[in-house]
Structures are given as structure tokens and as C-alpha cells.
């Protein structure tokens, strides 16, 4: 065994021991979190803390004790800190999609309309609801029943139910019924799991049926009017959503944020439709949050 391998084994053993101690003595949780969130932590210490945090989260999850109510950008959200999207925020204070959150804060105004396609547990719907105020509208689409229930609970927790309309549809290129693929990760599901940007992190297994609707059809039925911003994050089905809203893309949308890769089919569709693009957030080995605005709009 090499010296590096021996050191790695030692680090793993100490990390497991640290997690076991915190698991037995909850009073140690606060100082551990403070250490993990300290700015300027050297890389080796962060790696050690990361291993200990993962082991601790696993133990909490086995005890059905891994859910925490977190304060994120002024919103109260109950999340499972063992799941990847909440893990680093809880243990290391890393923000959720900071570029997109910062853009919302500068772009949305009181009275605006925000559409959240793939709202999940509702972080961006909550943030937008605060920004558009009681005179604005937030329209959230979330077909996954469990995620939609969490979204509704978060609206109640933050006293924002009157500002957010929640719909059970999956936006798509046709209206009807489609098969959604459930991941072992409770908050994620996709119409096209082989195109999901997190397919290398999670596996998709069980399926269930969901109602689908073209956004143009929904918009015509509800006389939606001008939309200041639409966020589309639908686990690989972004192109299907865009193909169901050509009228909205021609008029009625001031900006679109898409989770997609540069030069993807969805990216090319928007650029061919006359939208300019800039990146808000980038992720290692993953898609980007990309902002699209009509060329006629000066930002």
C-alpha cells in the first residue's frame, strides 16, 4: 500500500469516527457546521469535512432524521440534507444557484409575473413571490406529487400561498398524459431520464403517469398576459417545453432561464428564435443556467 493510500485510509477512518461522535452527541453538530462553513478553509480540511459530513448525513438518513428547516435567501425550506442538492448548503454554506438567485433579485419587480416550470420544492417560486409582491403573480408547474406537496408546505411556512398558483402539469410539446420516471432521489423525476443532467448521480426506476400541457395552450386558457421571466428546469425535457410554446417565444416573454448545455438543441432553438444568451451559473460536468433575452430587449 502506498503512503498516499495509507493516508487516505486514515482520513476515512477519522472522518467516520468524527461522524459517529457527532451522531452520538448532537451538541457537537454546531461546532462541526461552523468549521465546515469557515471561509478560507484549506483544501485538505475541506475534503476531510466533506467525508465526515457525508457519513453523518448517511447516519441521519438511516435514522429518518436528516430533514432540517433551512433559511435560504430569507426563505424557510425543509430539506433532506443527505440529498446532494441540500448537502453542501447545509454543511458548507454554499448557496443554491447563486447566479440565478442574484438575477431574480435584480430583474423581478413588484407586479411582475414569473413562471417556474419544474418548480420542485419551490425555492425560486418562494424567492420570486417575495420580489413580485402581492400585486405580482408566480405560476409554478410541478407534476411530481411529492415535490408539489413540499412546495405547498413551503408556501404555508412562508405565508405566501396567496401569491403562488401551483399546477400539477408537466409542460411539454403536446397536451395529454405522459410517463414520468422517478429517481431514487425523492425530489427528482423526468420525462426523458436518459437526457437528465443528473443521470450520472441518480438512477431512475419507478414510473407514473402525469398530465401534460403545452404552455401556449395553458397561456391561452388563462389569459396570462406579459411574463417578465420564465425559468425552465425540467431534468432534460427543456426542448419539449420550448416546442410547446412558440407563440410565447414570439411575444409575451421578456426573459427565459434554461438549465441546459451550450449548443444543446434547446439552446439552438432559442438562439434561432432571436434570443441572445449569457451564463448565470456553471456546474462541473453538468449543464448551465443560461439566460436568454430577445435581441430587441436592451438589458
Task: Name each model feature, range by range.
Residues 2-299:
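Phosphate/nucleotide-binding beta-alpha loop and adjacent structural elements of enzyme active sites
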Amino acid at each position: 500500500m502506498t503512503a498516499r493510500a495509507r493516508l487516505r485510509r486514515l482520513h476515512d477512518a477519522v472522518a467516520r469516527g468524527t461522524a459517529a461522535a457527532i451522531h452520538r452527541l448532537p451538541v457537537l453538530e454546531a461546532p462541526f457546521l461552523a468549521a465546515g462553513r469557515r471561509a478560507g478553509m484549506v483544501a485538505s480540511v475541506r475534503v476531510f469535512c466533506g467525508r465526515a459530513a457525508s457519513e453523518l448525513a448517511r447516519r441521519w438518513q438511516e435514522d429518518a432524521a436528516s430533514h432540517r428547516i433551512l433559511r435560504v435567501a430569507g426563505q424557510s425550506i425543509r430539506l433532506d440534507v443527505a440529498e446532494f442538492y441540500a448537502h453542501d448548503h447545509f454543511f458548507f454554506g454554499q448557496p443554491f444557484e447563486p447566479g440565478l438567485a442574484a438575477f431574480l433579485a435584480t430583474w423581478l419587480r413588484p407586479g411582475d409575473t414569473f413562471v417556474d416550470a419544474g418548480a420542485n420544492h419551490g425555492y425560486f417560486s418562494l424567492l420570486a413571490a417575495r420580489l413580485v409582491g402581492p400585486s405580482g403573480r408566480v405560476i409554478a408547474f410541478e407534476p411530481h406529487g411529492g415535490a408539489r406537496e413540499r412546495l405547498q408546505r413551503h408556501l404555508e411556512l412562508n405565508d405566501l400561498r396567496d401569491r403562488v398558483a401551483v399546477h400539477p402539469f408537466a409542460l411539454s410539446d403536446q397536451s395529454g398524459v405522459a410517463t414520468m420516471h422517478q429517481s431514487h432521489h425523492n425530489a427528482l423525476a423526468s420525462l426523458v431520464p436518459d437526457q437528465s443532467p443528473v443521470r450520472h448521480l441518480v438512477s431512475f426506476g419507478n414510473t407514473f403517469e402525469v398530465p401534460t400541457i403545452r404552455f401556449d395552450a395553458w397561456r391561452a386558457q388563462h389569459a396570462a398576459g406579459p411574463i417578465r421571466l420564465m425559468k425552465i428546469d425540467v431534468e432534460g425535457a427543456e426542448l419539449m417545453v420550448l416546442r410547446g410554446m412558440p407563440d410565447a417565444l414570439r411575444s409575451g416573454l421578456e426573459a427565459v432561464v434554461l438549465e441546459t448545455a451550450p449548443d444543446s438543441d434547446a439552446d439552438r432553438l432559442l438562439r434561432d428564435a432571436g434570443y441572445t444568451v449569457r451564463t448565470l451559473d456553471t456546474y462541473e460536468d453538468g449543464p448551465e443556467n443560461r439566460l436568454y433575452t430577445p435581441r430587441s430587449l436592451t438589458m
